[in-house]
């Protein structure tokens, strides 16, 4: 079977998939958690959708002064890449907070990396610097 035949993509609320009892080998939530009202509940739902030993991958913005300067001040107000008010600094999570929330949701964080945007090439690159944008990979216990 071709990989594309096995990819499942659907625009639906996370809770609906949980209610349907769906599970997946890998669950990705990229640039979402900083917009949800209850990150712990959100991670519990991600965990419920992930099979045992399956992968859960999240990306978000660190709650740091550097992230405030680049993700809010620069991206929203100076460069206007995003509408003003898209992000609230208080909704950002530190890597330590995200790790703790995921652990409580039975997801063991295995790896974390930063990623940075290169405006010259227009590409995102992985980095050791998790002070602004970061991505976490974990497995369901």
Residue ranges and their predicted role:
Residues 66, 119-121:
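Generic structural signal for helix capping and beta-alpha/helix-loop junctions
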Residues 122-141:
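Core SAM-dependent methyltransferase catalytic element
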Residues 89-112:
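Short alpha-helix
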Residues 60, 77-97:
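Acceptor-substrate binding/catalytic loop of class I
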Residues 67-78:
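Short, flexible, mixed-charge acidic loops at enzyme active sites
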Residues 63, 116-117:
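Short, solvent-exposed loop/turn segments at secondary-structure junctions
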């Amino acid at each position: 079977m071709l990989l594309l035949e096995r990819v499942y993509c659907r625009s639906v609320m996370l809770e609906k998939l949980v209610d349907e009892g769906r599970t997946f080998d890998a669950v990705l939530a990229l640039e979402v958690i900083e917009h949800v009202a209850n990150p712990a509940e959100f991670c519990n739902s991600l965990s419920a959708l992930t099979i045992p030993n399956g992968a859960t991958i999240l990306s978000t913005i660190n709650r740091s002064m550097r992230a405030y300067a680049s993700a809010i001040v620069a991206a929203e107000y100076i460069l206007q890449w995003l509408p003003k008010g898209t992000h609230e600094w208080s909704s950002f999570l530190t890597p330590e907070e995200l790790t703790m929330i995921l652990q409580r949701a039975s997801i063991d964080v295995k790896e974390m990396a930063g990623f940075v945007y290169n405006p010259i090439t227009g590409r995102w690159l992985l980095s050791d610097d998790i002070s602004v944008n970061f991505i976490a990979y974990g497995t369901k216990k």
